[in-house]
């Protein structure tokens, strides 16, 4: 044991409204028989710069209200009854210098990490922000269920990479589901077990995939209950209140700057701090100085500085959405209040990883118009950047913003092509035809209903052509085709996928209304929705007249045509006298490091949630461990620890403040399903929704 000598310890004594700080010698206290030992959570060193640099709401009155001229409001988290850990993420907690095992053993750990008990140095607060939700300005939103706890100083010795990602050396921690705030609107500030587990698992899964994201350190549940109408059918039930610990350099978002917005011409709403121009400038200065220090140092001219800042946010956003597209991730609620100013994936609600590839994939069942579909994400992110630019006027001149926005699409395309070349193992050359090869791959996947994750993972098994194979190229293509046919959809799967969600009679009525009474039609529906439903109906009719054998012939033609082009492109990777075996070894390595073996599919999350709702948290913990190594082929993936035999559901949580939930109408009996397989039939019943 280290010598105690004259070493001093900072000792906190909590009293109502007061924290008295005393410096006492270890030896003296030991003589008095008083223990000075504090847990690692109680030793966290806070430096809450955001509350020092940005204005705090002077009002402490309880209840929902408009907060003007302030960025944060002080709050008191509502304690949970008998909180307990569901799971913790060791890598995420390590950012704070915490050891996961020590945190799990701490009897006060669940209380501290749910906000039920306030850690020394923590200053609970809720952040004020606005947002465009589904294209309409919604006015004040804010942290309706989340609570800022403070900013923890990172432990010494963090990697240079981490310091680049987080130059402040502080990690903001917040608890989501900690109770009422001034921004809770009609909700209760609580989250339930379902949505909390989804956010916890997906935060860590996305990080492990190499995609920028906020982190999740823990998920805590409790004996506190809230009422939720799970299926939106008027039959509410009581559910367990749960809390996620979220970690990021900052949770400031595009919508943080929209609190200064003038009255919107369409909705009539305005930001609560409209007219407080000096506050907008102050917030902009805070963000750039703390999170973009190189820009702050290198651009003394304010216009140039603000333009450089907006350019960097644009670059990060373009890179982020390109990474989403390349792993088949759909966010679900890309409102401006869910867009990070740091280019991080923020707010996991009705997200989804694609199973069967569909460019029109909509993971959020509340998104009736498909505004936030998979293929719409790049354009929506540009639209959100344009709203951010408007919010920064006049600190960011409109002409400068437009110049930057013109660069967004080329930036996105470059990031996307770069990532896709790695996924296809095209490493030695960049050819103009690569873009068409990728486009044709996606079209083939769509035509065959191929599984997104497994198809890309399988491509590394298609080798570069060798001299020996040249004599029997047709057999090689046949074998590769069989490989990808295994990941393609069956006739019944395609029928289920293309079944319209609208009754054909309702669809016919809407088509007639669109022609006879366009104004009424616009009030009831939109052309995009009807068009997608008609396309589904048309394809379903075609499938009804197709046999399984005919479908296989079509799929075989699609895949063999593309594989032939792919092999020709791979042959050009091996020109100039290179060793084909060396090229093949390197491309397999790169491909397997860019094409995950396992992602957080909805059925995996559902099994973990159903087990947890039955009191078994082991499946959440097991799934977390698997998702921490998504590119590895791990043992035991074929035998999930919990199989969900009882038909338990993963229904949705009504949440008027932000997002998310997931609804399922009863999954029926379930069998053993590997984590790395195509989803089981019952997974089609999972319905993830959003209520704003």
UniProtKB/Swiss-Prot annotation:
Its cofactor is Mg(2+). Its EC number is 2.7.7.108. The active site is at residue 337. Residues 637-676 are annotated as: Disordered. It is found in: Mitochondrion. Residues 1-24 form a transit peptide. InterPro entries: SelO. ATP binds at residues 142, 144, 176, 188-189, 246, 253, 347. PANTHER family: PROTEIN ADENYLYLTRANSFERASE SELO, MITOCHONDRIAL, SELENOPROTEIN O. Belongs to the SELO family. This is Protein adenylyltransferase SelO-1, mitochondrial. The gene is selenoo1.
